[in-house]
């Protein structure tokens, strides 16, 4: 059950990143992700850090619009 709860918290973020990249050719900002999923930038940043740690998404530190889902 904890895994399901965890997936329900990060799945919308992964979906938003993938959709944004597909439509725009580059990654979204944290602010844009937060707007789409209806969460604070702090909450999104926390989830992004976990997703990066788990290898689900990647980004280039210090550069904007490099967040993307690992294929």
Located regions from the model:
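Short, cationic-aromatic polyanion-contact patches
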Residues: 4-10, 29, 60-71
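Pre-recognition alpha-helix immediately N-terminal to the DNA-recognition helix
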Residues: 12-19
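Short helix-capping/hinge SLiMs at alpha-helix to coil transitions
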Residues: 19-25
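A short alpha-helical element within helix-turn-helix/winged-helix DNA-binding domains
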Residues: 27-36
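Key DNA-contact positions within bacterial/archaeal DNA-binding proteins
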Residues: 42
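A short, conserved structural fragment
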Residues: 52-62
